[in-house]
Amino acid sequence: MKNQTYHNEQIVKNTAKLRNVLKDFPDFALDFFTGIENKTSALTRLNYAYDLRTFFKWAVQETNLFRGKEVFDLEVSDLEKFHTTHFERYMSYLTSYTDENGEIITNGERGKARKLAAVRSFFKYYFRREMIKVDLASKIEMPKLHDKPIIKLEEDEMYKFLDTVENGYGLSGHEKGFHKHTKVRDTAIMTLLLGTGLRVSECVGLNIEDLDFKINALKVTRKGGNQVILYFNDEVKLALYNWLEERACNPILVDEPALFTSLQNKRISTRAVEKLVKKYAGIVTPLKHITPHKLRSTYGTRLYHETQDIYVVADVLGHRDVNTTKKHYAAISDEIRRQASKAVTLRK
């Protein structure tokens, strides 16, 4: 698959996973996934399949609606047997349940909202095509989502984080053994994430040919497959250049297109980068639970503070809806709150 882009490889993998999950679905349900194919990604359809599988298993195993039936046996007319109370019970069930592997699964408000959205889309599809007479799933209100504070690295934490990545401060003896082989690569990855706000999937999907050092730019494939050109500063350029110099010394990687590779000489995975961020950030700020997405938030926050232009931030981060950006980055900053607290005095 080396001749394919990372984005295309992921489409192939997710499509294969989707087809495997759909083997246990009722025949009529396949129409839904075919119907939404042109306006959703393979990953979105796969997540829909996972969420709908949970719903169907609950309906067959936890209710009296379909006694003696398996999920595979359901027919489109069975969708009309659901009442609003069934959907409400399902939402309650999602709070905590045991899956087929005996693992306890819990869902907060966001997990419930995502799973309900999948069910509502499913019922809406068949109602619009007049295959069912009523769509009661649409009557169920989505869970109220409470705003979450932006978790990010403060400026001093960011400096310490990069120093830790580069020098291995705080690592165990075992970790230092690996670090001497990966520190240049890790420094390039973390500097790139903090210096551009890339998603972790966009970062690991980069190929060497996507870089242009003449103009300090890189070509990124966004969610949905759109390609954009992003620019980086000289600090990011130096970190990338150092990694490419070291990478060039490994003859095994001559035919490997991926920019960032693992110790197994393959494209590094998103999971591997997540573990690296957790390891280094855990030394600097253990209470914040920093993830690659939090590094993205760090960049977005700093960019907004520097530009005060929410549209620039939305464009650079690849947000399709500027309201998403406004929600997260246009709030009053901690620094402004601190200054405001000193503005009112109680005693002269």
Outline where the language-model segments fall.
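Conserved catalytic core of the tyrosine transesterase superfamily
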Residues: M1-K348
